[in-house]
């Protein structure tokens, strides 16, 4: 998507803050639209870490780079929390590809956003 957002939700289920940075799709679009002659590519699993052609290099950079960035941020969050082990849930159209390459345990929940919206609806319908 256009943005990757990390939200910290406390054990009391309150939003405590977060981080936001360019998402996978925005990063791919930036490479193809703002650099000389790089193609638009699809986001799919790379054949190997080190690409052998332009498209494979772009794909590996995104598919391995985004999880490495997330792992680094998760490690820093863990340090900020005094070593507490956070639960990590990924959503969004690119999450299944990216979460697979994270070294931290990441649970993919395809319906988390819809479940949250439904919970808000139910709360307000009362």
Regions from the PLM with identified roles:
Residues 11-16, 104-108:
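A glycine- and small-aliphatic-rich helix-loop capping segment at beta-alpha/alpha-beta transitions
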Residues 27-126:
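ATP-binding/phosphotransfer module of carbohydrate and carboxylate kinases, centering on a glycine-rich
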Residues 1-3, 24, 91-93:
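A short acidic Gly-Thr/Ser loop motif
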Residues 15-32:
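Short, acidic/small-residue loops that bind anionic groups at enzyme active sites
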Residues 1-15, 31, 117:
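Gly/Thr-rich phosphate-binding beta-strand-loop-beta motif of the actin/hexokinase/Hsp70
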Residues 10, 22, 37-38:
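C-terminal nuclease/phosphodiesterase catalytic domains that cleave nucleic-acid phosphodiester bonds
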Residues 5, 19-20, 65-66:
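Active-site-proximal catalytic alpha-helix in oxidoreductases
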């Amino acid at each position: 998507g256009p943005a990757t957002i990390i939200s910290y939700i406390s054990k009391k289920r309150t939003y405590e803050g977060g981080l936001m940075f360019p998402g996978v799709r925005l990063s791919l679009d930036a490479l193809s639209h703002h650099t000389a002659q790089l193609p638009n590519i699809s986001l799919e699993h790379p054949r190997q870490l080190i690409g052998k052609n332009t498209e494979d290099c772009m794909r590996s950079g995104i598919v391995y780079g985004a999880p490495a960035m997330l792992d680094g941020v998760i490690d820093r969050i863990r340090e900020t929390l005094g070593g507490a082990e956070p639960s990590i849930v990924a959503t969004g159209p690119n999450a299944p590809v990216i979460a697979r390459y994270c070294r931290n345990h990441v649970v993919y929940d395809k319906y988390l956003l819809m479940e949250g919206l439904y919970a808000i609806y139910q709360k307000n319908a009362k």
